[in-house]
Amino acid sequence: LVLFTGGEDVEPSFYGEDKGRFTRCNKGRDNLEFQMAADFYNVPKLGICRGAQFLTVHSGGRLIQHVENHGVSHNIVFEYPVKGTYEISSTHHQMMYPFNLKEVDYRVCAYSEYFRSELYYNGNNKNIDLPKNFVEPEVVYYPKTKSFCIQGHPEFSSISDDFKKLMLRIISTMLNV
């Protein structure tokens, strides 16, 4: 298992956009992690926060460069591989956007219980058009790259131990580790 962790924003040029005013990147780290992801292509990968965003881009997805109201604890709704609503801590202002991919190339496992952001900015600092059935993805699996991506921070101490144990079981199930 290869773990990709939190940190600076992913360089937007890697997903075909210009850098917006809210975006702060470390292109050196991005280059290093793209090389690591290539070297370990067939190894299961787990991304948390920025790591989830990075693995989304590595898997061919895009990012929404800026969203509002996601830097706090909030509820997410799991639909796969379990069902239920759980609290998770978040510190992000960017968001995974797998919806440009074919549906067979990703699975949204969990999403925000309700829309937290009123605006979704791209690199031109403009509100983007969202697909018809848009949800704010919080947990996404990319089968081709064996990448399981968690936008929030299940490891934070404010989250219940039961949820942490559940997340470990989900990660083990999804990545077969």
Question: What positions do the PLM features span?
Answer:
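Amide-donor transfer/coupling interface in amidating biosynthetic enzymes
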Residues: 4, 29-43, 66-177
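Short glycine-rich anion-binding loops that position phosphate/pyrophosphate groups of nucleotides
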Residues: 7-10
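Glycine- (often His-adjacent) and acidic-residue-rich active-site loop
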Residues: 12-19
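A short acidic, glycine-rich active-site loop
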Residues: 21-31
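Catalytic nucleophile loop
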Residues: 40-60, 153
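Class I SAM-dependent methyltransferase SAM-binding "motif I" and its flanking Rossmann-like core
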Residues: 63
